[in-house]
Design a protein with these regions (language model features):
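N-terminal lobe of the biotin/lipoate ligase/transferase fold
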Residues: 1-160, 165-166
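Short, structured patches in soluble enzyme cores that scaffold and shape functional sites
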Residues: 117-119, 173, 184-188, 210-213
């Protein structure tokens, strides 16, 4: 069973991590997969919250949950990322974070739907490939509802429209419990992708729902 909800009290970038964590844990329901929308949040604050929730879910002290949100402008490096994939021309208003997720460099910012599934796979299917393919399939099906022909690309992660990536993915699993997740480009400022080699891939580009449809879509509408 799936339960979707937003928090009773509005959140913003100034809401501290302890308050956000307390509201999430108080609202999550047992025996369902919980979905929650947190609005726009700073990356490091949410990384801290992710790690705290991950410990709870991993030890069966909290049900599995998917956090939906947007971030302020930030470039994040995966554990083994090549730092040369970020070009010197990146905007001054962009934060840089070295993360513990898998994958290479990626960008997060306004106009992207970020999804952090913190899921104990011991209660589902203990398979990394199953988990990644499931995330990809959910995004593909969502995009199909907007008449966007999206699919996987052989040998690559994420979701693609022809030769352009529309959704990047990078996760971390510990004791079969996931954290980090995906970034779906809805209507972000695409200039931020010009300052890096997205996911370390030279041969293909990046696109967004706005680029494909030529119309703006509210991020929260996708959830």
């Amino acid at each position: 069973m799936i339960e979707s909800y937003t928090l009773n009290k509005p959140l913003n970038n100034k809401t501290n991590s302890d308050t956000i964590l307390a509201q999430i844990t108080a609202s999550a329901k047992d025996e369902v997969l919980n979905f929650i929308y947190l609005g726009k949040q700073e990356y490091n604050k949410m990384w801290k919250i992710q790690k705290q929730i991950h410990e709870l879910v991993k030890n069966d002290n909290m049900p599995s949950i998917v956090l939906f949100l947007e971030h302020d402008h930030v470039y994040t490096f995966g554990k083994n990322s090549n730092k040369d994939f970020l070009l010197d021309s990146y905007p001054d208003n962009t934060q840089i974070v070295e993360s513990d997720r898998g994958g290479q460099i990626t960008y997060h910012g306004p106009g992207q739907l970020i999804g952090y599934p913190i899921i104990n796979l011991n209660h589902f299917t203990k398979s990394v490939s199953w988990f990644m393919r499931s995330l990809e399939q959910i995004i593909i099906m969502t995009l199909h509802e907007y008449n966007i022909s999206a699919d996987r690309k052989e040998g690559m992660t994420g979701v693609w429209v022809d030769n352009e990536k529309i959704c990047a993915m990078g996760v971390r699993l510990s004791r079969w419990t996931s954290m980090h997740g995906f970034a779906l480009n809805i209507n972000p400022d695409m200039k931020y992708f010009d300052c890096m080699i997205p996911c370390g891939i030279f041969d293909y580009g990046v696109t967004s729902m706005y680029d494909v449809l030529s119309k703006e879509i509210e991020v929260k509408e996708i959830i």
